[in-house]
Structures are given as structure tokens and as C-alpha cells.
From Swiss-Prot:
Record-given protein name: ATP synthase subunit beta, chloroplastic
GO BP of this protein: proton motive force-driven mitochondrial ATP synthesis
Organism this protein belongs to: Angiopteris lygodiifolia
Enzyme Commission (EC) number: 7.1.2.2
InterPro entries, per the entry: AAA+_ATPase, ATP-synt_VA_C, ATP_synth_F1_bsu, ATPase_a/bsu_AS, ATPase_alpha/beta_chains, ATPase_F1/V1/A1_a/bsu_N, ATPase_F1/V1/A1_a/bsu_N_sf, ATPase_F1/V1/A1_a/bsu_nucl-bd
Quaternary organization: F-type ATPases have 2 components, CF(1) - the catalytic core - and CF(0) - the membrane proton channel. CF(1) has five subunits: alpha(3), beta(3), gamma(1), delta(1), epsilon(1). CF(0) has four main subunits: a(1), b(1), b'(1) and c(9-12).
Compartment annotation: Plastid, Chloroplast thylakoid membrane
Amino acid sequence: MKTNPLVFVVSTAVEKNAGYITQIIGPVLDVAFSPGKLPNIYNSLIVKGQNPAGQEINVTCEVQQLLGNDRVRAVAMSATDGLMRGMKVIDTGAPLSVPVGEVTLGRIFNVLGEPVDNLGPVDAGTTSPIHKSAPAFTQLDTKLSIFETGIKVVDLLAPYRRGGKIGLFGGAGVGKTVLIMELINNIAKAHGGVSVFGGVGERTREGNDLYMEMKESKVINQENISESKVALVYGQMNEPPGARMRVGLTALTMAEYFRDVNKQDVLLFIDNIFRFVQAGSEVSASSGRMPSAVGYQPTLATEMGSLQERITSTKEGSITSIQAVYVPADDLTDPAPATTFAHSDATTVLSRGLAAKGIYPAVDPLDSTSTMLQPWIVGEEHYETAQGVKQTLQRYKELQDIIAILGLDELSEEDRLTVARARKIERFLSQPFFVAEVFTGSPGKYVSLIETIKGFQMILSGELDSLPEQAFYLVGNIDEATAKAATLQVES
């Protein structure tokens, strides 16, 4: 059994390789070592001592740069309050290592792999370093299969790939976290395997809500914690940038163990990948690097690649990753979301315009894309229906300027029919969520792919032209829409 390299090396290297702090700039420390005793890049350093008030200090740092003159620059994983120049720093001789395996299930960890849920220590028989290379080309698996989510707009227009990377792109307050919670609800509960959730730089309240929700739904089993199906890793908004920059790697390391050693199919949820980039930008600026476009770090593409390339499917097992991506000022050309786009197999773009109309999930059907929407993967019927829906919505979008200036009456009969069907499609793409039941008062709905295709085919064919458009709003399958239309008719 592998020992924890962190503990093992510290015990033997205390006197052998110690340095002292020469400079502190916020979360970044410069540390001087003896000549020829410099730690490697990504090595973990530990600062121990007492602050002026006499309280014990134990801060873990990670080496980022070798500066010359026997000095290194490191970034702290926790607050640097109370640190002073001259304090002793110990080189552990190894990268940061975190617990992996079944012991992580049902627990909440921080970036260092320490439990933060007040349920006692974790018996970490096996640990793993958070920095690794991506699997070799020969190990990768290229099978293509659809991952059904039960959400109509996703399954029809931008289907997810099993073992793929999915990005949920959206500005502030358009519903990224609610959508990721619904996906956890629909997929993680039905999916027999394990899930890992990485909370990267998001609200602590949301992390707490998710934990409570998982306990209620028995995804985390409080009576018998070993029967839980999920491990949670949090580095929230109040943490220093070093922790937010590395917490995604901690979650990924736990997921990789389930894939490579236990040979399982794993779900990895990350909320929010933009905060990983943002933390890297803070660290980069504090380290004295020249900023690149829009003030981001010059190493943006490299940092994103080192995380994303490890999230993949091998012949041993798969990691299906669903990542929320904050879009600053709703600008998809911003370097952070633009870099993430390149790594995604499917992109679900959330629109502020749809959210303002009250259509939830506010997924933009024309901006969202998927590499899986090919007739030879999803089948001719699915492909033709999806293309029909997109063409109808695109024509409606083109006609909106004419409608705004001249009104509906000036349109041709054919265009008026297109507009009526497009408005029904737009409303039928909305759906009540299980996780939003408390707010909407409507019970959540899971709609199978077969039901979804059938419903949109009926709208496109004109079978439902006589039904009012409000009958299609916030319903599950098409039978519910026809039942709602009958109810509306009786009421009127």
C-alpha cells in the first residue's frame, strides 16, 4: 500500500532541506534555500511557526517559479496572515498529494485533501499527487455514445457525449448552477457509478445547498457513509487564489483514481471553470508576469490544457465532465470562455434574452452546439427533427425585425405559420426542474429522448397548430401539453 508522500517526506527532510521566507506579496511568497538544495517546480512547501499573537501557523505552498540566487516563488494554499520574513519553510520533496478511493465518498474536502465536514479524519490508505500528465494517445477510448439527460433542449439540439466534456456557458444569473444541479439530480441518481463535484470559486451558500440536497436524496448516505456515491471538493470564493487555482486538480485527481484503478465510469462536475482561470490570473499578476489579452495570464491556454487534457476516457474507464463556465459581460469572445470552447464536445449556451422571457432552462437553441449531432451517431430521425427545429427558430429570428416594425399582419401566410410554430417550439423547450420545485411550485419532469423527438415532430408537422402556445410552456412531454390545452379551453 502506498504511503502518503507528504507525510513520509516531511519526516525525513526537516533538517535536510529547509529555507526561509524573504518576501511576501499577498498570497505569493519568495523563499531562499541553501545552494544546490532548491525544490522542484510544483513541490509542496510547508511554513510552520507562530504569529505575533502566539498562535500556531501551518501554511502549505506550491512552488511556481525558480528565480535564481537560490530563491523560489511559491503560492500559498491558505491565508498568509501572520507570516513574516525569516520564517522557516520546509520542502516536502513531492507535489501536493490528496486522499483517493472509496474513503473520499460522502465527504467534503478542501484543496489539500483535508476533510472540512466535521465528520472526523479520513483514513487515507492511498494518496495521489495532483499534478500528472494526461493519458497517452494509445490509452484513449474513441467510442461514441449519447448521454441522455432528460432535459429536452439538451437531448434534442446539443446532445452530450458519454465520456465527453460539456461546457455550460452563461453570464451572471441566467441559471448555470441550477442547470448543473438538475444534471446532478437526473444523471448522478440514475447513474450507478460515482461522481465527483469540484466547487471552484463559487458561492459557499450554493455548496452548502448542494450538500444538503445530496443528503436528502441519499446520494450521500449519512447512516452508512461508505455507501455514498459522491465526493465533494470545495475551494469557494473566500479562499485565496492558490486554493481556487488548484481545487479543480484535487477533484480531478480523485476522479482519475476511480477511472484508472477502479475501472469505473465517473461523472466530474465543475462549477465554475472560469474561477480557475480567474485565480490563475491573480496568481500570475502577483508573481510579476506580464499580463496578456484582457489582463489574463500569458499561460492561459497551457493551464487550461493541463486540466482539460486529463479529463478523458481511456480503455479502463471514462470521465464525463460537465463544467459551468461564467461568461464575463455575456461576451463569448472573452479569452476565458473562448479557450474553454476549444476543449468542449458539447456547448450549452444560456441566453439572457430567454431568461428575461421566463423560458427556463434558458438554453439558446441556435448557439448551443454538439459534435454528437450527426445522423450516423444519433440517427436520421433525431437529426432531421433537430434541424427542422433549428430552421424554424432561425426563420423566426430573421422575421423578428419585420414583426417589430410592421406587425404580424404584414407577413405572408407561410411566415405567420412559421412564427406560430416557432413560438410553440420556444415554449416547449422550457421544462420544470426537480431542483427548482421549491421556487416554481411545479413538479420536475424527466423527458426521455424518444418522447422529446415525438413531441417536436408533432409541432413541426402541424398536428398541433390548433393548440394555444401557452399550453406548451413549462410542461414535460407532448401529452402534458395537449392535456394542458384541454384544461385551458375548459377554463376559458
